[in-house]
């Protein structure tokens, strides 16, 4: 089991549920567009910005980079940039740290890509679905999206030469992906007289469910990613493109969605992004949000 996913079910040192399936976000890129521009796949922010510049010079009709700062998923954009700059929603103690220096730097970098003309023209209104359509049509060279994009592109009749990789991070920072997982949880019936038999049956079910081949086949059928390393390795043997997801799954971070203020934070970071797109100061916006949330 990938530790990052198992930790999402842990409260006060006790694991209360088992992750049964996962999804994650990674960077998709159009191989032909990057090749035509003569750029390597970017792994750092400096490389990303340089790649955007070359792509724009080579093919001005293509948006080098896709950004979604809409009310649909603007909080995801916040995570993509802040996590990959060593920041994020909370600090190492789990306290809100929305206006950290790293977060300010991260959002200024993202807004800078927009202001430099390297992104889709309307990030406040163009959702990730719009970006996926643009990517499929060859109008966006690179974007961050979920693991079901291949299915989305296939169902939409798109035919492009693309690949997936880790999200670019600032120099000196590790790449971090956004993870999502569902969980299985079994409740104990204290009134039942056959506790040992019930426990044995539950164990038998989990052994059956997480059998490597069976579990891997189930993930393929459902279109999700496995939460176990062994199933991921098994899938990677049969699908070279899946090998990229092993590194991505190991790097996942998650929204602090269990914190009571999360709904307000989610809406708040979207408003920060959209006001920053209009020219407001990122530091001031995040300071105000931090004060509203944490006092």
Predicted regions, residues:
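Hinge/lid segment of periplasmic solute-binding proteins
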Residues: 1-25, 40, 49, 77, ...
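Paired acidic/hydrophobic, glycine-rich loop segments that form the ligand-binding mouth/hinge
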Residues: 141-146, 163
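Glycine-centered hinge/linker elements that transmit conformational signals in sensory
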Residues: 52-54, 95-124
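C-terminal capping/gating helix-and-loop segments adjacent to ligand/active sites or protein-protein/ligand interfaces
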Residues: 10, 222-225, 243-293
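Short, solvent-exposed loop/beta-turn-alpha elements that line the ligand-binding surface or hinge
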Residues: 1, 40, 64-69, 87-107, ...
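Short helix-initiation/N-cap motifs at beta->coil->alpha
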Residues: 45-49, 122-136
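Short helices/loops that flank or line small-molecule/ion binding pockets
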Residues: 33-34, 53-57, 129-143, 278
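Extracytoplasmic/periplasmic substrate-recognition and gating elements
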Residues: 36-37, 116, 155-222
């Amino acid at each position: 089991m990938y530790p990052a996913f198992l930790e999402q079910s842990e409260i006060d040192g006790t694991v209360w549920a088992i992750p049964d399936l996962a999804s994650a976000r990674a960077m998709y890129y159009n191989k032909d567009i990057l090749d035509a521009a003569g750029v390597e796949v970017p792994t750092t922010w400096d490389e990303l910005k340089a790649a955007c510049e070359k792509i724009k010079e080579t093919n001005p009709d293509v948006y080098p980079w896709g950004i979604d700062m809409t009310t649909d998923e603007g909080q995801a954009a916040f995570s993509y940039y802040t996590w990959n700059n060593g920041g994020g929603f909370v600090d190492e103690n789990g306290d809100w740290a929305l206006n950290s220096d790293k977060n300010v730097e991260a959002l200024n970098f993202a807004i800078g890509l927009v202001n430099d003309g390297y992104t889709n023209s309307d990030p406040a209104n163009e959702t990730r679905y719009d970006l996926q359509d643009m990517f499929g049509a060859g109008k966006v060279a690179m974007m961050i999206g979920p693991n079901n994009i291949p299915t989305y592109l296939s169902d939409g009749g798109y035919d492009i030469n693309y690949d997936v990789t880790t999200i670019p991070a600032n120099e000196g920072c590790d790449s971090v992906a956004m993870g999502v997982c569902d969980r299985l949880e079994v409740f104990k019936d204290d009134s039942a007289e056959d506790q040992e038999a019930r426990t044995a049956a539950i164990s038998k079910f989990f052994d059956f469910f997480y059998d490597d081949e069976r579990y891997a086949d189930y993930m393929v059928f459902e279109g999700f990613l496995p939460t176990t390393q062994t199933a991921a390795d098994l899938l990677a043997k049969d699908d070279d493109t899946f090998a990229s997801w092993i590194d991505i799954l190991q790097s996942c971070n998650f929204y602090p969605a269990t914190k009571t203020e999360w709904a307000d934070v989610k809406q708040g970071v979207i408003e920060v992004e959209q006001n920053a797109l209009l020219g407001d100061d990122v530091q001031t916006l995040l300071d105000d949000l931090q004060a509203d949330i944490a006092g």
